[in-house]
């Protein structure tokens, strides 16, 4: 039994172990499966998000190919653009060269004319020299007269030529301005359209932007989505881990349950055995019979049966339970499969959508890869607009400068002419033979008047010729226009005739068909006739019957013959008409060809005539006003001529219409006459045939009826029948012709009616056109009249301006110049006097200041003359002298500042004076140079006069102009140099006060840094003294202001006087000085405020906080050590725990809660300490800086002390040296001041180095208390915030708490097992409990880490808020000021960087911008080409209608050429 029991126990234990192992294995496999599924899903997501290598390589290849293609296209575009640019450049050069050629040719022509005039004059002189054989005196007189006349003639001719050139030039400029205006208008229109397009695009872009913004507002940012995804992944991982842990725990719990059930069963079986054994023992004790054995066995059987029944019931219940579980598992598996399928499909859909989205994104990227962003486009548009505006401005400036240049040239020429006239007058007045010269001039003037009259007559003749030629041209134009109209009409007529010809051909073909049919019919009739003739009348019949039959047949034949004859004639007439029409058409075509050829020959001749006339009209010498008047007259005349032409054309059309109608009427009449004649002829023929027939009939009747018909009779009959047949044929043909003629007549009537309607329509149209043209011409005439009135007004204004100019020029320039020079000299003298007065006043001020200082020092020293020892004086009077020395120092500083300001003003005034003197000297030099140049010019004039006496005045006006131009250029260069010097001086003047100001500020800062403690103590005592000093200084200021006001008044008067010379530099200088002074005052005020704040702050915060920081460090270290110790204790308690009793677990739970509380407390303390540390770290560098400053102060004071001691030693040594009493007194005073300073600084050092005074201690304690209160407030605030955070995060922790409670319940169930007394079972239970506890511990540690992490996050969030609450408002102010200063510096740096960036951007500008510009250029060129084509069409139309149009293309080309090349001014 024992063995069996042992084996039973072993097997049961093995079963238990096997079950546990199998369960564990199955759990592991399930967990592995779940983890694998999760990992596979994660990997699948990664794969879905990623792209395959093949696709990537494909995309890279496509990208590379696209980039290569794009590069090639760009290179090609660049090449094309370069080519087009080169071509345009060459075209422009060609045009400019052509223009230069033309200008050179014109100049050559002018020079030829001039040469011709000179040769004529020379020939006249030679003729006169040869012819005159008079006396010598007379010869000399005549020669001089001839020379003067010839000079004047040549001068007049030169003037004429110059005026011609001017007129041509003005005409060119007028045309150029017109074209430029047109271009500007076109450009404006284009810009407006572009602007409209841009606004539309901008609006669309704004809408799109708004849409995108709305979408963005609705959407989530990428960072948030990425964070959410990561969080989801982490949550999924944690979920999987928790599932794994739950499955493990379930397995453990299942195993424990099974073991408990097995143990219960074993216990029950043992109890039963014990009971059975007891009963057996009792039975044995009672009796040992066989009956008793049987009964016992029976009892045993009964008990076994009962146990079997119970076991069967249990088995059945277990089987039912199993069935239920299997059904439940099947359902769950079905649900799982369905869910997995749904998941699979959802994933598939998601992948497909993701792929589709990626593809769309890639395609969109490819589409919009090269697209420019809106910001860049806006930049480009802005830059374009700016460039265009700059270009327009530059163009305007160019035009203005050119106009000024021309006006100056004209003035110089006028001045030269006047100079020459004046020189002639002066020479005549100087000569003794003045009267003779006057007489000779009088004679010359009379001759010139005669010549003028002749020239006027010639001019009148020329004008008449021009008018005649204009009339001829207008006639030619009229003829050309009429011929063109005729050509057009003939072309139309020819086309109509061609159409008619085609129609007639078709009709003739039809007629041919008809004739063929008729022929066939005639043949049939002939056959019938033959048959009829063949069938003679029956001879059996009586003769009268036979005759009647014969007569009937003859009549029919005659009728047929007549008809055929008529048709034949009508056909012949039609043939003739058609032949005549053909001839006419051929003649018309030939005449048209001839006319066209003649016109082609005439057109170039007329063009040449027009050119000649234009050149002739250009050569006319008239001023601008006359020219404009003439142009207006010409245009009016042209318009009238056009009107006349139009009227003549209308008349011609009317005449043509009347002719056409007459022709139509004549044709109709002819047709009617022809019809009448035909009818008469037919009637005559019919009458003749009837009479003949009657005669023949009577002859037959008269003849005897008896004779038998012979062969002759038969022959006669046959002949008669033939004639009858012929007549019938002719009659039939005539009938057909009649029908045709009637049809033709009807057609002709229809055609004539149509033509009449067309002519009437034409007439109406022409009348309407004529009315419109008349209205237009009237409007143009009115416009031209307005223009005439305006031009007359302009001419009057020009005349008045000319008169004023003449009057202004008549005044002698030398006298004005002298007056100006004298004025300038007087102003200079006044300025020098003012300068001297100011310098005297300044010297007096300085002297007064020094005297006052000396008097104060003497008074100070005279009080202490009695005292011999310096040490005793220092000991007694330190306190008394302290305040006085400080006051004096302050006074000295103020006086120094006042001196510096006065010096600055002095410097500015001296600089102004120097500038004025320099300018005056420069102007005097320039005036001297001008005088010298004038003398040189006079000498050159004299030389030229001598040359002119030898030769005739030809092309020798050029050197003068060249010299003048060189002079002007030199003067301009000098002016530029002077301006640059002025600018430099102004910059230096601005720089000097800035440097002085910076140096002064540095000195003041250093001195005030040394005296910041003493100033606070002595401020109250010094207020009254300062007020007195302020009063004195205000008085001084008022006096100085009065002086300055006087100086300003004098300056204004001087400026008014000097306005004629244009001196305005003083004003600029004064304004700049005032601005600089204002800025200085503002900066001083700001400096003083800042210094006061800094001193206040330093007084408050000059506490050594090193001890506080050290205390905080020690506290931190102690707390950290405590934390470490607590953590170690925790770890020991976790591992070394007694595992026998269930009470320990409760203790452990309580301990854990206490530890958590302690941990929270420690973390809060840690946070506080960290805050304190951060504050200390922030204060550390400031305190270090303070210590450093104090050390430097100490060292500096030591050095000063040593120096003072050295000086004292020297003073003691040189007491008995050969110095005067006042010098010694001064030195003693200075020494006193130095010693007082040293004592003060020593006291300060003692205070600093020694223990803190009671007041400072009290302050420190107060601050400490404040800081503690703030710390407590912070703690409270932090506690509130943490409680808020914990409340918000309580929901998250509730789940973890619930899981913990569930685990604790399971732990309690496990602890019940610990009460079992057996050793093996308790050990296993303890191991399981350990596992469970470790799991719980690990979970709690995780919770703890999470809580710590959350606390740190909250600390980080609340960190900046908590650090703000600093008590000292002044510190905040100083910090604010410092930050403002830093921000200003940063802004400056930022601005500099931005400027550099902008420069770099300008240097490295995008090539796309230039490409856009080149595209615009290309478009512009294409538009120009289109414009040229349209202008050519316009020209053709204008030539057709005889309207003159100036081509805007030519004008634009001229404009471009003038832009590239300077304007070719005419040579005077």
Curated annotation (Swiss-Prot):
<feature type="coiled-coil region">
    <location>
        <begin position="52"/>
        <end position="121"/>
    </location>
</feature>
<feature type="coiled-coil region">
    <location>
        <begin position="172"/>
        <end position="292"/>
    </location>
</feature>
<dbReference type="GO" id="GO:0090316">
    <property type="term" value="P:positive regulation of intracellular protein transport"/>
</dbReference>
<feature type="coiled-coil region">
    <location>
        <begin position="318"/>
        <end position="528"/>
    </location>
</feature>
<keyword id="KW-0653">Protein transport</keyword>
<keyword id="KW-0813">Transport</keyword>
<dbReference type="GO" id="GO:0015031">
    <property type="term" value="P:protein transport"/>
</dbReference>
<dbReference type="GO" id="GO:0005814">
    <property type="term" value="C:centriole"/>
</dbReference>
<dbReference type="GO" id="GO:0005829">
    <property type="term" value="C:cytosol"/>
</dbReference>
<keyword id="KW-0969">Cilium</keyword>
<protein>
    <recommendedName>
        <fullName>Centrosomal protein of 290 kDa</fullName>
    </recommendedName>
</protein>
<feature type="region of interest" description="Self-association (with itself or N-terminus)">
    <location>
        <begin position="1060"/>
        <end position="1468"/>
    </location>
</feature>
<keyword id="KW-0539">Nucleus</keyword>
<feature type="region of interest" description="Disordered">
    <location>
        <begin position="1130"/>
        <end position="1152"/>
    </location>
</feature>
<dbReference type="GO" id="GO:0031410">
    <property type="term" value="C:cytoplasmic vesicle"/>
</dbReference>
<dbReference type="InterPro" id="IPR026201">
    <property type="entry name" value="Cep290"/>
</dbReference>
<keyword id="KW-0970">Cilium biogenesis/degradation</keyword>
<feature type="coiled-coil region">
    <location>
        <begin position="559"/>
        <end position="592"/>
    </location>
</feature>
<dbReference type="InterPro" id="IPR032321">
    <property type="entry name" value="Cep209_CC5"/>
</dbReference>
<dbReference type="GO" id="GO:0045893">
    <property type="term" value="P:positive regulation of DNA-templated transcription"/>
</dbReference>
<keyword id="KW-0206">Cytoskeleton</keyword>
<comment type="function">
    <text>Involved in early and late steps in cilia formation. Its association with CCP110 is required for inhibition of primary cilia formation by CCP110. May play a role in early ciliogenesis in the disappearance of centriolar satellites and in the transition of primary ciliar vesicles (PCVs) to capped ciliary vesicles (CCVs). Required for the centrosomal recruitment of RAB8A and for the targeting of centriole satellite proteins to centrosomes such as of PCM1.</text>
</comment>
<keyword id="KW-0968">Cytoplasmic vesicle</keyword>
<dbReference type="GO" id="GO:0005634">
    <property type="term" value="C:nucleus"/>
</dbReference>
<dbReference type="GO" id="GO:0034451">
    <property type="term" value="C:centriolar satellite"/>
</dbReference>
<keyword id="KW-0966">Cell projection</keyword>
<keyword id="KW-0010">Activator</keyword>
<comment type="subunit">
    <text>Part of the tectonic-like complex (also named B9 complex). Interacts with ATF4 via its N-terminal region. Associates with the BBSome complex, interacting (via N-terminus) with BBS4. Interacts with IQCB1/NPHP5; IQCB1 and CEP290/NPHP6 are proposed to form a functional NPHP5-6 module localized to the centrosome. Interacts with NPHP4; the interaction likely requires additional interactors. Interacts with ZNF423, FAM161A, CEP162, CEP162, CEP131, TALPID3, CCDC13, CC2D2A, RPGRIP1. Can self-associate (homo- or heteromeric). Interacts with CCP110; required for suppressing cilia formation.</text>
</comment>
<keyword id="KW-0832">Ubl conjugation</keyword>
<feature type="coiled-coil region">
    <location>
        <begin position="736"/>
        <end position="1441"/>
    </location>
</feature>
<dbReference type="GO" id="GO:0032391">
    <property type="term" value="C:photoreceptor connecting cilium"/>
</dbReference>
<feature type="coiled-coil region">
    <location>
        <begin position="627"/>
        <end position="688"/>
    </location>
</feature>
<keyword id="KW-0175">Coiled coil</keyword>
<dbReference type="GO" id="GO:0036038">
    <property type="term" value="C:MKS complex"/>
</dbReference>
<dbReference type="GO" id="GO:0005813">
    <property type="term" value="C:centrosome"/>
</dbReference>
<feature type="coiled-coil region">
    <location>
        <begin position="1"/>
        <end position="25"/>
    </location>
</feature>
<keyword id="KW-0963">Cytoplasm</keyword>
<dbReference type="Pfam" id="PF16574">
    <property type="entry name" value="CEP209_CC5"/>
</dbReference>
<dbReference type="GO" id="GO:0030030">
    <property type="term" value="P:cell projection organization"/>
</dbReference>
């Amino acid at each position: 039994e024992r063995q069996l029991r042992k084996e039973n126990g072993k097997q049961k234990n093995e079963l238990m172990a096997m079950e546990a192992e199998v369960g564990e294995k199955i759990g592991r496999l399930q967990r592995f499966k779940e983890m694998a599924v999760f990992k596979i899903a994660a990997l699948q997501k990664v794969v879905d998000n990623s792209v395959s290598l093949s696709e990537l390589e494909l995309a890279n290849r496509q990208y590379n190919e696209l980039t290569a293609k794009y590069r090639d296209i760009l290179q090609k575009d660049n090449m094309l653009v370069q080519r087009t640019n080169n071509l345009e450049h060459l075209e422009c050069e060609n045009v400019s060269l052509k223009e230069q050629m033309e200008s050179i040719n014109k100049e050559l022509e002018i020079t030829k004319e001039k040469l011709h005039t000179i040769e004529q004059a020379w020939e006249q002189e030679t003729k006169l020299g040869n012819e005159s054989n008079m006396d010598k005196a007379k010869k000399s007189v005549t020669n001089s007269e001839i020379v003067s006349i010839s000079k004047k003639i040549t001068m007049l001719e030169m003037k004429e030529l110059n005026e011609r050139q001017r007129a041509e030039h003005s005409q060119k400029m007028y045309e150029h301005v017109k074209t430029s205006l047109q271009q500007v208008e076109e450009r404006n229109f284009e810009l407006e359209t572009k602007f409209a397009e841009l606004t539309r695009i901008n609006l669309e872009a704004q809408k799109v932007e708004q849409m995108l913004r709305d979408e963005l507002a609705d959407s989530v940012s990428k960072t948030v989505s990425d964070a959410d995804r990561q969080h989801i992944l982490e949550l999924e991982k944690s979920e999987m881990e928790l599932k794994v842990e739950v499955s493990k725990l379930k397995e453990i719990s299942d195993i424990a349950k099974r073991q408990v059930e097995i143990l219960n069963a074993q216990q029950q079986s043992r109890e039963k055995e014990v009971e059975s054994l007891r009963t057996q023992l009792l039975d044995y004790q009672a009796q040992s019979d066989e009956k008793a054995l049987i009964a016992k066995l029976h009892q045993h059987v009964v008990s076994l049966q009962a146990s079997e029944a119970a076991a069967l019931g249990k088995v059945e219940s277990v089987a039912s339970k199993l069935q239920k579980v299997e059904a439940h598992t099947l359902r769950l598996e079905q649900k799982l499969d369905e869910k997995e399928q749904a998941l699979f499909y959802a994933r598939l859909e998601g992948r497909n959508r993701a792929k589709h989205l990626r593809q769309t994104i890639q395609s969109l990227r490819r589409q919009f890869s090269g697209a420019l962003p809106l910001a860049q486009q806006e930049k480009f548009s802005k830059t374009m607009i700016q460039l265009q505006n700059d270009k327009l401005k530059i163009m305007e400036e160019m035009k203005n400068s050119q106009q000024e240049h021309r006006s100056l040239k004209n003035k110089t020429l006028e001045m030269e002419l006047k100079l020459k006239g004046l020189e002639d007058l002066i020479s005549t007045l100087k000569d003794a033979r003045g009267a003779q010269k006057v007489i000779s001039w009088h004679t010359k003037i009379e001759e010139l008047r005669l010549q003028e009259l002749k020239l006027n007559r010639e001019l009148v003749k020329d004008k008449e010729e021009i008018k005649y030629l204009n009339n001829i041209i207008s006639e030619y134009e009229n003829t050309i226009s009429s011929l063109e109209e005729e050509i057009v009409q003939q072309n139309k007529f020819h086309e109509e005739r061609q159409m008619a010809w085609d129609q007639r051909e078709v009709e003739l073909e039809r007629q041919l068909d008809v004739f063929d049919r008729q022929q066939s019919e005639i043949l049939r009739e002939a056959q019938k006739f033959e048959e009829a003739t063949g069938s003679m009348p029956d001879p059996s019949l009586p003769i009268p019957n036979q005759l009647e039959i014969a007569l009937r047949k003859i009549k029919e034949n005659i009728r047929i013959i007549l008809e055929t004859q008529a048709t034949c004639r009508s056909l012949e007439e039609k043939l003739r008409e058609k032949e005549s029409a053909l001839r006419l058409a051929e003649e018309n075509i030939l005449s048209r060809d001839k006319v066209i050829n003649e016109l082609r020959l005439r057109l170039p001749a007329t063009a040449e005539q027009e050119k000649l006339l234009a050149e002739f009209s250009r050569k006319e010498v008239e001023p601008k006003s006359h020219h404009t008047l003439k142009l207006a007259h010409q245009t009016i005349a042209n318009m009238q001529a056009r009107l006349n032409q139009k009227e003549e054309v209308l008349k011609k059309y009317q005449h043509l219409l009347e002719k056409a109608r007459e022709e139509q009427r004549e044709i109709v009449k002819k047709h009617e006459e022809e019809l009448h004649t035909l009818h008469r002829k037919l009637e005559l023929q019919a009458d003749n045939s009837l009479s003949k027939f009657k005669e023949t009939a009577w002859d037959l009747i008269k003849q005897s009826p008896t004779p038998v018909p012979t062969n002759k009779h038969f022959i006669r009959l046959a002949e008669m029948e033939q004639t009858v047949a012929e007549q019938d044929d002719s009659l039939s043909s005539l009938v057909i012709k009649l029908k045709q003629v009637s049809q033709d007549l009807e057609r002709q009537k229809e055609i004539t009616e149509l033509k009449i309607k067309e002519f009437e329509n034409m007439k109406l149209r022409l009348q309407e056109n004529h009315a419109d043209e008349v209205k237009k011409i009237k409007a143009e005439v009115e416009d031209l009249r307005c223009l005439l009135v305006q031009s007359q007004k302009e001419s009057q204004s020009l005349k008045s301006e000319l008169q004023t100019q003449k009057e202004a020029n008549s005044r002698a320039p030398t006298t004005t110049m002298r007056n100006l020079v004298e004025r300038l000299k007087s102003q200079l003298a006044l300025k020098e006097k003012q300068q001297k007065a100011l310098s005297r006043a300044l010297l007096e001020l300085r002297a007064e200041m020094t005297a006052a200082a000396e008097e104060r020092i003497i008074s100070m020293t005279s009080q202490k003359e009695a005292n011999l020892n310096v040490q005793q004086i220092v000991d007694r009077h330190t306190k008394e002298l302290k305040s006085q020395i400080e006051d004096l120092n302050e006074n000295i500083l103020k006086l120094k500042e006042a001196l510096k300001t006065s010096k600055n003003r002095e410097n500015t005034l001296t600089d102004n004076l120097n500038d004025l003197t320099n300018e005056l000297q420069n102007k005097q030099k320039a005036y001297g140079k001008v005088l010298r140049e004038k003398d040189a010019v006079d000498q050159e004039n004299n030389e030229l006069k001598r040359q002119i006496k030898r030769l005739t005045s030809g092309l020798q006006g050029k050197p003068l102009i060249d010299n003048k131009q060189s002079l002007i250029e030199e003067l301009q260069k000098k002016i530029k140099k002077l301006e640059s010097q002025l600018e430099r001086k102004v910059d230096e003047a601005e720089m000097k006060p800035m440097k002085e100001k910076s140096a002064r500020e540095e000195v003041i800062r250093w001195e005030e840094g040394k005296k910041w403690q003493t100033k606070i103590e002595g401020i109250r005592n010094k207020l009254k003294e300062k007020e007195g000093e302020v009063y004195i200084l205000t008085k001084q200021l008022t006096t100085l202001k009065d002086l300055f006001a006087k100086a300003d008044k004098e300056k204004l008067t001087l400026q008014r006087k000097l306005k004629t010379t244009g001196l305005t530099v003083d004003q600029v200088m004064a304004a700049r000085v005032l601005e600089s002074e204002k800025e200085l005052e503002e900066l001083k005020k700001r400096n003083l405020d800042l210094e006061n704040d800094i001193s206040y702050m330093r007084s408050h915060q000059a506490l050594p906080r090193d001890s506080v920081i050290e205390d905080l460090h020690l506290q931190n270290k102690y707390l950290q050590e405590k934390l470490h110790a607590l953590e170690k204790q925790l770890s020991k308690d976790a591992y070394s725990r007694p595992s026998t009793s269930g009470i320990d677990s409760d203790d452990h739970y309580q301990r854990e809660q206490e530890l958590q509380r302690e941990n929270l407390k420690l973390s809060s303390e840690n946070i506080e300490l960290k805050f304190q540390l951060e504050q200390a770290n922030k204060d550390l560098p400031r305190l270090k800086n303070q210590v450093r400053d104090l050390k430097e102060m100490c060292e500096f004071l030591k050095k000063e002390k040593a120096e003072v001691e050295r000086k004292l030693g020297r003073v003691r040594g040189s007491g008995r040296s050969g110095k005067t009493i006042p010098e010694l007194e001064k030195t003693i005073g200075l020494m006193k001041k130095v010693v007082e300073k040293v004592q003060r600084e020593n006291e300060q050092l003692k205070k600093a180095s020694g223990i803190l005074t009671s007041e400072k201690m009290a302050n420190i304690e107060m601050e400490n208390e404040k800081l503690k209160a703030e710390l407590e407030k912070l703690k409270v605030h932090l506690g509130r915030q943490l409680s808020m955070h914990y409340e918000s995060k309580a929901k998250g922790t509730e789940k973890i708490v619930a899981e913990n409670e569930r685990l604790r319940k399971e732990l309690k169930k496990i602890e019940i097992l610990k009460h079992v007394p057996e050793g093996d079972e308790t050990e296993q239970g303890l191991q399981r409990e350990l596992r469970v506890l470790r799991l719980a511990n690990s979970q709690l540690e995780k919770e703890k880490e999470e809580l710590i992490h959350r606390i740190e996050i909250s600390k980080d969030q609340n960190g900046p808020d908590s650090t703000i609450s600093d008590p000292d408002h002044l510190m905040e102010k100083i910090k604010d000021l410092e930050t403002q200063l830093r921000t200003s510096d940063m802004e400056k740096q930022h601005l500099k960087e931005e400027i550099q960036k902008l420069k770099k951007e300008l240097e490295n500008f995008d090539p796309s911008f230039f490409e856009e510009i080149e595209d615009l250029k290309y478009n512009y060129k294409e538009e120009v080409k289109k414009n040229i084509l349209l202008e050519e069409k316009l020209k053709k139309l204008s030539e057709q209608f005889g309207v003159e149009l100036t081509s805007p293309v030519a004008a634009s080309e001229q404009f471009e050429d003038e832009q590239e090349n300077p304007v070719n001014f005419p040579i005077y």
